[in-house]
Amino acid sequence: MDIAQLVDMLSHMAHQAGQAINDKMNGNDLLNPESMIKAQFALQQYSTFINYESSLIKMIKDMLSGIIAKI
């Protein structure tokens, strides 16, 4: 398992989700309820990617700390 590749993939997906937010905020009339729902969904996707990436990095750090502590 290549951890760097996994983190890079998650970072790329988070970047794409961030771009989707920019597109939704700039391109549409935010007074339209449908546009607001789409923007909210894009924000939720971005938040989910960031939280998942953060949790994964913390899990790896904790695992490595546990291994080092046992050495």
UniProtKB/Swiss-Prot annotation:
Gene Ontology annotations of biological process type: protein secretion by the type III secretion system
Protein's cellular compartments: Secreted; Cell surface
GO cellular component, one term: type III protein secretion system complex
Domain of life: Bacteria
Keyword check for Protein transport: yes
Induction info: Expressed when residing in the host ileal loop, host macrophages, and when in an acidic environment. Repressed by methyl-3,4-dephostatin.
SUPFAM superfamilies: MxiH-like
Alphabetical UniProt keywords: Protein transport, Secreted, Transport, Virulence
Family annotation (InterPro entries): T3SS_needle-like, T3SS_needle-like_sf, T3SS_needle_YscF
One Pfam match: T3SS_needle_F
Function per UniProt: Component of the type III secretion system (T3SS), also called injectisome, which is used to inject bacterial effector proteins into eukaryotic host cells. SsaG/SctF2 forms the external needle filament that protrudes from the bacterial surface. During infection, can induce innate immune responses. The needle proteins interact with host TLR2 or TLR4, and induce signaling by NF-kappa-B and/or AP-1. This activation is MyD88 dependent and results in increased expression of cytokines, including TNF-alpha, IL-6 and IL-8.
Quaternary structure and interacting proteins, as annotated: The core secretion machinery of the T3SS is composed of approximately 20 different proteins, including cytoplasmic components, a base, an export apparatus and a needle. This subunit polymerizes and forms the helical needle filament.
Family that this chain belongs to: Belongs to the SctF family.
Protein name: SPI-2 type 3 secretion system needle filament protein
This protein's encoding gene: sctF2
